[in-house]
A protein has these predicted regions:
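Conserved phosphate-donor/acceptor-positioning beta-strand/loop module used by diverse small-molecule
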Residues: 96-117
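Pre-Walker A (Motif I) flank of P-loop NTPase domains
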Residues: 2-7, 77
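Post-Walker A alpha-helix
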Residues: 20-21, 25
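Conserved nucleotide-sensing/catalytic segment adjacent to the nucleotide-binding pocket
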Residues: 32-35, 41-84
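Residues at the beta-strand->loop junction immediately N-terminal to the Walker
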Residues: 10
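The conserved Walker
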Residues: 13
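Conserved lysine of the Walker
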Residues: 17
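Small-molecule kinase domains that catalyze NTP-dependent phosphoryl transfer to phosphate-bearing small molecules
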Residues: 89, 124-170
């Protein structure tokens, strides 16, 4: 039986988590990717309101669907890469994690990436509304998230580095070999 190495990649939305995880998955053939976004956990009725401070909100998210898939994959793959915004902070997942990586990307880049990714076919009014929300509340949520989640990450990488450099840095720092 294989004992899985469980690597969580964390960061704010549009920070580069998914891109890095997909590249790790290509590099490590005997791996599985589990992504928080695939479960719409933040849309469950039990999810805390967005304005709830991340320190209070993190363990209010119901991870049972994600955990079910994780536990069925655990020890069947050499590596499990989890695209998960909260690093070690959720008690349901924490004890299974081998290492966490926090992708720290400047918030102006995050904002621009999110507009390009999520608003490319939206109206000017919708883009302007998102910009107002970002300035009024989302930016502070992202700042709080970054501080709280990155404080106990095993590795913090610069999200502005080219992907190949990020991959090389993660592999070297975490001593990952395929």
């Amino acid at each position: 039986m294989t004992k899985s190495i469980v690597i969580v990649i964390s960061g704010v939305t549009a920070g580069g988590k998914t891109t890095l995880i997909n590249e790790l998955h290509k590099e490590f053939i005997d791996s599985k990717v589990i992504s928080f976004d695939d479960y719409s956990i933040d849309a469950f009725p039990s999810a805390p309101p967005i304005e709830t401070p991340v320190q209070e909100a993190v363990n209010q998210y119901d991870l049972r669907p994600l955990m079910k898939d994780f536990l069925s994959a655990k020890d069947r793959f050499s590596f499990i890469f989890i695209d998960f915004p909260f690093g070690y902070k959720h008690t349901m997942l924490e004890s299974y994690i081998t290492k966490t990586v926090y992708v720290k990307t400047p918030l102006d880049i995050v904002f621009a990436r999110q507009i390009v990714r999520d608003y490319y076919n939206k109206s000017t009014e919708e883009i302007t509304n998102w910009a107002k929300i970002y300035l009024d509340s989302a930016r502070q949520i992202f700042t709080d998230h970054e501080y709280f989640v990155s404080e106990d990450a095993d590795l913090i990488i610069d999200g502005t580095l080219p992907l190949a450099e990020q991959l090389k840095f993660v592999k070297k720092a975490l001593q990952l070999k395929n």
